[in-house]
Amino acid sequence: MNGNPELPTDTADQHWNKIWNNLEKGSKWLMPEPDVERWAKGLKAGSAILDLGAGVGRHALALNSAGFDVAALDAAPGGLAEINRAGPEVETKLGRMDQLPFTDACFDHVLSWNVIYHGDETIVLNTISEVRRVLKPGGTFLLTMLSKRRLRIDQKNLNGPREISRNTWVFDENSSDKIHPHYYCDAIEMLCLFQGFEVLWMEDREHEKPGSWHWHLILERRA
């Protein structure tokens, strides 16, 4: 491993800010995920929800339209600008996922779709701790993580794979966010990350692209 502990690893927002600033109409990034819609149907109307890593607001805006009290946080200002234009009633915050600018236990639920694995293990652990801090006891956390099934495929198909720290990989792919650190884990490693949470649902499956294995989880914050 040749990582430099002095360099930040949660840098993928640099890539995504460029994407958000040049987003085309009809992009898949404007369409909410079915998993999120199903999860939301089981939540109490008016619940306070944090969309952590909201991007251009595909979930924050849909949740707001469904009657929830939504806050959207992202480190990429381009995405938040899109949310402000489309749904000014959604509270937007520019910030880092491991330093959430919210008070303790202020959200009933938290959503983070394809977000918190952008960084090394320290970033991931600090982010999980922050989510637990802002989430009310008994509240749920819907999220995805990168599976090590995906790592084997990425190592084969992407250029210059390098493990810069434990389970944290970068690739020489200038047109992809994979040039920035990504954290991959198997089931045991992942469950060890989520101290203070109960697992309600967990599944390792592909997204729309073959080989794009992600863990899908719904967790409950323990008291």
Feature-to-residue mapping (PLM):
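Class I (Rossmann-like) S-adenosyl-L-methionine-dependent methyltransferase catalytic domain
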Residues: 1-44, 56-99, 142-223
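Conserved beta-strand/loop positions that form the S-adenosyl-L-methionine
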Residues: 52
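A short acidic, Gly/Pro-enriched loop at the edge of an enzyme's catalytic core
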Residues: 98-110
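A short beta-strand submotif of the Rossmann-like class I SAM-dependent methyltransferase core
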Residues: 112-115
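A short His-aromatic
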Residues: 117-119
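A short glycine-rich, Lys/Arg-flanked "PGG" loop and its adjoining helix->strand segment in the class I
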Residues: 125-137
